[in-house]
């Protein structure tokens, strides 16, 4: 889910037409598919500005991907709006959303556990009552992992996944969030 697709203007959310992510999730359920939701707020995915809305650039001296209070306020507004659309569609509510990701590859950027904890709490407070997870490369799990979220790895599957995940969550589950067969 890309934040900039749903909040093109500050405080104005669009979940209609092509932006109707709830309809997409329901369609997946009709087809017998489950959804692993990755709401960001930073999505990366080689998407413009990592999925952040461009209007954030007007905020002078605001630090992105941090516990900057202004940034967190905008993140919370977005996560709450997304929760109204999608939290009713979790598997615990009869839907098909299995898991929700907290941030994206944060360990390669910084190690601000307070920021990650704030996002984790926002996601829970928005009604997402399914397991949460983080995803990082093997060498960045320490910085990107947060209590209350399963650590997952990005990259190519190898035996190292067991050792790395066991360090933070003994016994798994073992999950490669992004598999790179070629780059």
Language-model region placement:
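A broadly conserved amphipathic alpha-helix scaffold signal in soluble, globular proteins
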Residues: 22-29, 80-84, 98
């Amino acid at each position: 889910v890309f934040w900039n697709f749903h909040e093109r203007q500050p405080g104005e959310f669009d979940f209609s037409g092509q932006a109707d992510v709830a309809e997409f999730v329901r369609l997946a359920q009709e087809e017998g598919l489950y959804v692993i939701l990755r709401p960001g707020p930073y999505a990366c995915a080689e998407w413009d500005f990592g999925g952040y809305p461009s209007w954030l650039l007007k905020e002078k001296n605001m630090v992105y991907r941090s516990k900057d209070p202004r940034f967190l306020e905008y993140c919370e507004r977005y996560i709450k709006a997304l929760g109204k659309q999608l939290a009713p569609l979790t598997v615990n509510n009869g839907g098909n959303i299995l898991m929700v990701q907290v941030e994206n590859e944060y360990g390669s950027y910084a190690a601000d556990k307070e920021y990650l904890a704030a996002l984790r709490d926002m996601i829970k407070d928005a009604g997402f009552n399914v397991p949460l997870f983080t995803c990082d490369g093997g060498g960045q799990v320490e910085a990107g992992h947060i209590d209350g979220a399963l650590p997952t790895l990005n990259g190519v599957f190898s035996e190292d996944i067991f050792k790395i995940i066991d360090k933070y969550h003994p016994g798994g589950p073992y999950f490669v969030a992004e598999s790179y067969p070629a780059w």
